[in-house]
Curated annotation (Swiss-Prot):
Transmembrane stretches, start-end: 2-19
PROSITE patterns the UniProt entry points to: CYTOCHROME_P450
InterPro entries in the cross-refs: Cyt_P450, Cyt_P450_CS, Cyt_P450_E_grp-I, Cyt_P450_sf
Record has Lyase as a keyword: no
Single GO molecular function: diferuloyl mono-(hydroxyferuloyl) spermidine meta-hydroxylase activity
Effect of deleting the gene: Drastic reduction in flower buds of the content in N1,N5,N10-tri-(hydroxyferuloyl)-spermidine and N1,N5-di(hydroxyferuloyl)-N10-sinapoyl-spermidine.
Keywords annotated in UniProt: Heme, Iron, Membrane, Metal-binding, Monooxygenase, Oxidoreductase, Transmembrane, Transmembrane helix
Protein name as annotated: Cytochrome P450 98A8
Free-text tissue specificity from the UniProt record: Strongly expressed in inflorescence tips, young flower buds, seeds, stamen, tapetum and pollen.
Length: 497
């Protein structure tokens, strides 16, 4: 028997080699991988930059081996259309890392399935329909006003006897206004200061752990010796910390009577009581909304403000429009957005040049398909390089120039219909909160420009426009700027503490 099995071994090995050769045949070109590591040793911390450089060599569709996982990256609008529209059904699953993605029971990381459709429909009806967005409009406007008041109060407290103007950290106010808006939308209240600080600390730790586990999650044989590189105890402690925060800040809502419908979480808890959703799904869905909604919106606004400090003529043009349309006796509201075309273009230009997720979240092929004349095997990961497409000279004149006027010359949809600019994705996996995000970004940015003039703390000093590695495209150095109150801000009565 043993001799018989040994005699079959060469046949088995040859069969496996032939299958592997067939499986790899006709896949897109790309850098030559190394045994076991694939191309991981060649990857820069900013993956999108590596993919863009390889695309210049091998073409707009490439194969990259992330450890043992085949990854196909597309970097042109035409190929993005094929992935997100023409082959959307076959490429709507998610490639996910088990430790960091809620095991696929949430909305963001679940495969395309009846479960996903159910969660998306629930979120759309309760949070992201036009009716829901309009119902919560006053909430967003109140938070924008609170942001302006907070900046004014800090400017007053920061000015010493010499009346020297001190810079403000823009991210501080963006993080607060967006998180407060999302939390009130989700649970009907703002987080307390300690809850907010703990939430931010947990998110930062999660990004750090995700980065430290990258190689382990893609190279199967390293998992055998994972204790050399990564502490599972550290991750488990982080998971417990996140669960504790979630139960304290969110699930305490279970103590409220079911009839008290305050926020989206109340609806989820009703479904949990009815056994339609598990606690894990509720937790994952709420975490999706809090982290994705808060982080992605604030990131884009910070980049836009940095660009307008670099290019003051854009800032002045947006302010002139606001002064003409809104005046100086009141703050801008969401009802003003349709009659502020240049401000809308500023937001679109920021989304084009600085999408919050430069690599669209990874898709996974549920069956073998052909894209751009190449085979994408079943099980392959597929990335759309959104940043590269938004900066493609084939699509845009002077693509690295921040020039909102380009959107005045041509009506461009940024919510999934125009494949030259895809900040929210497209197709079945498109971000369901695209319209809400656009409204909030435009409102916050409009109030920042209407109420303050922004400039560099040191005249002539270059702003650090480098990017921080990670899933989100944060500015590596938080933006600091001088804020000079304008007429609209001076019309706001400050509350007495």
């Amino acid at each position: 028997m043993i001799i018989y099995l040994i005699s079959l071994l060469p046949i088995i090995v040859a069969t496996l080699m032939l299958y592997q050769r067939w499986w790899r045949s006709n896949i897109p070109p790309g850098p030559k991988p190394k045994f076991l590591l694939g191309n991981l040793h060649q990857m820069k911390p900013l993956w999108t930059h590596s993919f863009s450089e390889w695309s210049e060599t091998y073409g707009p569709i490439i194969s990259v081996w992330i450890g043992s996982q085949l990854t196909v990256v597309v970097s042109s609008s035409d190929l993005a259309r094929q992935v997100l529209r023409d082959k959307d059904h076959q490429l709507s699953n998610r490639h996910r890392i088990a430790r960091m993605t809620q095991t696929g029971t949430d909305l963001v990381w679940s495969d395309y399935s009846p479960h996903y459709v159910k969660l998306r429909k629930l979120c759309t009806l309760e949070l992201f329909s036009l009716k829901s967005i309009e119902n919560f409009r006053s909430l967003r406007e109140m938070e924008a006003r609170s942001m302006v008041v907070s900046i004014l109060k800090d400017l007053m407290s920061n000015s010493g006897d010499d009346q020297e103007r001190k810079p403000v950290i823009v991210r501080k106010y963006l993080a607060a206004v967006v998180l407060n808006t999302i939390s009130r939308l989700m649970i009907g209240k703002e987080f307390g200061s300690e809850e907010g600080k703990e939430f931010k600390a947990i998110v930062e730790k999660e990004h750090l752990l995700s980065g430290s586990g990258t190689i382990l999650d893609h190279v199967w044989w390293l998992k055998w010796v994972s204790s050399w590189f990564f502490s599972d105890k550290e991750f488990l402690a982080h998971k417990d910390r996140r669960t504790k925060w979630f139960r304290g800040a969110i699930m305490v809502e279970e103590d409220i009577e079911i009839e008290d419908h305050r926020g989206f979480v109340r609806k989820l808890l009703v479904l949990k009581e009815q056994k339609e959703l598990s606690e894990e799904t509720v937790g994952g869905l709420v975490w999706n909304m809090l982290t994705a909604g808060a982080d992605t919106t604030a990131v884009v606004i910070e980049w836009a403000m940095a660009e307008m400090i670099k290019c003051p003529t854009v800032q002045e043009k947006a302010q002139q429009e606001l002064d003409s349309v809104v005046g100086s006796e009141r703050l801008m509201t969401e009802s003003d957005i349709p009659i502020l075309p240049y401000l809308q273009c500023v937001v679109k230009e920021a989304l084009r040049l600085h999408p919050s997720t430069p690599l669209m979240l990874p898709h996974k092929a549920s069956e073998t398909v052909w894209v751009g004349g190449y085979k994408v095997p079943k099980g392959a990961t597929v990335y759309v390089n959104v940043q590269a497409i938004g900066r493609d000279p084939a699509n845009w004149i002077n693509p690295y120039e921040f020039r909102p006027e380009r959107f005045l010359q041509e009506e461009t949809d940024v919510k999934g219909r125009d494949f030259r600019v895809l900040p929210f994705g497209s197709g079945r996996r498109m971000c369901p909160a695209a319209q809400l995000s656009m409204n909030l970004m435009t409102l916050v940015m409009g109030n920042l420009l209407h109420c303050f003039s922004w400039s560099s703390p040191v005249p002539g000093e270059r702003i650090d426009m480098s990017e921080n590695p990670g899933l989100l495209c944060n500015m590596r150095t938080p933006l600091q700027a001088l804020a000079l109150p304008r007429a609209a801000a001076r019309a706001i009565p400050l509350p007495l503490d």
